[in-house]
Amino acid sequence: MSRMAEQQLYIHGGYTSATSGRTFETINPANGNVLATVQAAGREDVDRAVKSAQQGQKIWAAMTAMERSRILRRAVDILRERNDELAKLETLDTGKAYSETSTVDIVTGADVLEYYAGLIPALEGSQIPLRETSFVYTRREPLGVVAGIGAWNYPIQIALWKSAPALAAGNAMIFKPSEVTPLTALKLAEIYSEAGLPDGVFNVLPGVGAETGQYLTEHPGIAKVSFTGGVASGKKVMANSAASSLKEVTMELGGKSPLIVFDDADLDLAADIAMMANFFSSGQVCTNGTRVFVPAKCKAAFEQKILARVERIRAGDVFDPQTNFGPLVSFPHRDNVLRYIAKGQEEGARVLCGGDVLKGDGFDNGAWVAPTVFTDCRDDMTIVREEIFGPVMSILTYETEDEVIRRANDTDYGLAAGIVTADLNRAHRVIHQLEAGICWINTWGESPAEMPVGGYKHSGIGRENGVMTLQSYTQVKSIQVEMAKFQSIF
């Protein structure tokens, strides 16, 4: 693909130049080619976007629930009509295989938008009787202007996961995509406008997180910030949001999730789940189950099943329908993953497979890392303690149920967890003791629109998806009505 035209900001229903004068480049990580130069939003641009959003939000919130629902449903239809076009752009920008982006990224994002479009008319208050002459009623009102700050691994899906409930509740959103993968969020803004969303209700500000993101989190005109990213960045966002105007926050942060295989499990099923929990999207999924606990007596058999499945991984041309493994999202990220792999070897973990970059025709110019499996791992190893966010699996062994529960919970993270077992009683007994917000039994990775997702401990605050997320984009107003004569003590 030839280099795209310079990308601008999207404010008040159309493209506009950044006043900052700064730009950055977005790269195709499969081959290292520059996709586009992108303008970076500065402080004045954030001010413009907030004013635009404030104007648009008043118009949007004044519409009936059915009017808002119809507009969002039109956006869903356009997303599905343009699935292939958007998936191709997402593949170019992220490096993910087209077989993945065309069946997951836009599809699941559109599903979430459709889900919230359907919930809009059901967003209701309540009536509370006090006595014969008095009652209270409540209203769920929009927060106003909210900000979404996205991560680079699922650009358009995250933009939809954040904007769908926010818009459904009557808010306007200013969205800052990751500077690594900014392109499809701009296309989403076009689609919202085409569907009939009032100008200003969804503005997109590409830019560097330390600048554009900070301006958003500090801005007094922003009522809430929804952030997806790393723990360290999330803490800064939260601190800025509280210090500036006591904003509400939703934080979807990192994970180092355990996948526990029990001795009664079907090892073929367990190996299939472990592969998806580590190598789907080249390991760049926040919920990945990278700490794979297996009974000591099952270790050798499990390792052989993993090795057989690694042989089935098809890396290569990301637009080949048979390819199911792409490069990492950027060269700096590739180098960081390679540092972790080197650290694992240095600390004594044994490389079962991988452990280096992929080499040869089609790989040498891209950010490719081979699917890597470590075994003989210990809980104190860096690769077991820290989030790598790449195609790196760590296999650990255990002896008893109590032991593995304790070790699985021995982490600052608490995003996800999963178990594989044929024992229904054990499944629920163990899951109820795991300190994680998203749990799977005999499966991994699915996050449907109806399912609230979010983390315990350092993995986040609040939830995305589900009914409770729609409610989190509202504020409750309580009104008491007195029908009898008011009695004063004065």
Curated annotation (Swiss-Prot):
Binds 2 potassium ions per subunit. SUPFAM superfamilies: ALDH-like. NAD(+) binds at residues 150-152, 176-179, 230-233, 254, 286, 387. Signal peptide: none annotated. K(+) 1 binds at residues 26-27, 93, 180. The modification Cysteine sulfenic acid (-SOH) is found at residue 286. The record marks 248 as: Seems to be a necessary countercharge to the potassium cations. It comes from the Bacteria. Its EC number is 1.2.1.8. The active site is at residues 162, 252, 286, 464. Pfam families: Aldedh. Its cofactor is K(+). K(+) 2 binds at residues 246, 457, 460. Keywords: Metal-binding, NAD, NADP, Oxidation, Oxidoreductase, Potassium. It catalyses: betaine aldehyde + NAD(+) + H2O = glycine betaine + NADH + 2 H(+). One of its GO terms (biological process) is glycine betaine biosynthetic process from choline. Belongs to the aldehyde dehydrogenase family. Involved in the biosynthesis of the osmoprotectant glycine betaine. Catalyzes the irreversible oxidation of betaine aldehyde to the corresponding acid. Dimer of dimers. This is Betaine aldehyde dehydrogenase. The gene is betB.
